[in-house]
A protein has these predicted regions:
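Extracytoplasmic metal-acquisition and chelation regions
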Residues: 2, 22-303
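N-terminal export leaders
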Residues: 3-9
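N-terminal export signals
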Residues: 9-23
Length: 303
């Protein structure tokens, strides 16, 4: 793993709320010496499973009703981040509040893993990389590497946790991705926003929605009249087989397309921005979404 893509930060801020479990999402004893804080609970869930009993892992954004794009950090978040020896930030313009908290609370030896920097992405690129199966695995490797850098005596333990997470905890996740890709590659789908693009591409689906429409919905900017007409027509004429929308960001434009899709008899699947329910592990959440998508594709195609 290229450690130069991750920033060894002198700043630290705090986040707190949810203590995530070890493999499978269950509870377990935590080591008070290594504090890990993730800005979002999808990365926090993964970190908790990789760290096991060797760290306390907390996530700042844990409420499924919270919009991470417009989140206002609290003093409690700052206190939580301040204690972090490993901080995990999404970056890519998604959680700009998090680096500010970290910079306000320096901690010698802290490692800040910024997912965007790891992946070579910048503000303006698609920030929803936890929906990219390949990039999820790169983040898994980076978290495991950083845990080992902080606690080298536990290197063998962290390697074992990483192997178990990849081969056991994520087994159903990987199997569903391969199954959907094999059965439904090339099926035309529409989607409300850019959150679905990385997963849809990995599944081999034909993404018909204009990327400018999806980006505008994700960023809360105005959708062009031309894009509205295109997306409406795709639903009305059943040019898409399935419609996928982010249930945490239902704008009037999304509501309109939802209604058009239902009227046209197009199966609908939902995704969410963060773990939903918040008690789910990363893999439970993703598997549930993949299963819903697979059912929608099966209804649409009869396969």
């Amino acid at each position: 793993m290229d450690l130069n893509r991750r920033v060894l930060s002198s700043g630290a801020a705090v986040l707190g709320a949810l203590v995530l479990a070890s493999c499978g999402g269950g509870g377990g004893a935590k080591h008070a010496g290594l504090q890990v804080v993730a800005a979002e609970n999808f990365w926090g869930s993964i970190a908790g499973q990789l760290a096991g009993s060797k760290a306390t892992v907390s996530s700042i954004i844990v409420n499924p009703n919270t919009d991470p794009h417009s989140y206002d950090a609290t003093p409690a978040d700052a206190r939580t981040f301040a204690a972090a020896r490993l901080a995990i930030v999404n970056g890519i313009g998604y959680d700009d509040w998090a680096p500010k908290l970290l910079a306000a609370s320096p901690l010698s030896g802290r490692i800040t893993l910024t997912v965007g920097a790891l992946l070579g992405l910048r503000a303006g690129d698609n920030p929803h990389q936890w929906y990219s199966p390949g990039n999820v695995m790169r983040v898994v490797a980076a978290i495991s590497s950083d845990l080992t850098r902080l606690e080298p005596a536990d290197a063998a333990y962290f390697r074992g946790r990483e192997r178990a997470f990849e081969t056991t905890a994520l087994a159903r996740y990987h199997a569903l991705i391969a199954q959907i890709r094999a059965r439904y590659r090339g099926v035309a789908v529409g989607y409300s926003e850019s959150i679905f693009q990385p997963l849809g591409a990995a599944l081999g689906l034909r993404l018909l929605t204009p990327s400018s429409f999806a980006k505008a919905i994700a960023e809360g900017t105005d959708v062009t009249a031309a894009d509205k007409q295109t997306v409406d027509r795709q639903a009305q004429q059943r040019l898409i087989k399935v419609w996928v929308f982010n249930s945490q960001n239902v704008t009037p434009d999304v509501q309109r397309v939802n209604q058009l899709a239902r009227a046209a008899g197009i199966p609908i699947a939902t995704v969410t921005e963060t773990l939903s329910p918040a008690s789910d592990s990363f893999q439970q959440w993703q598997v549930s979404e993949l299963e819903r998508l697979e059912r929608a594709l099966a209804r649409a195609t009869g396969r």
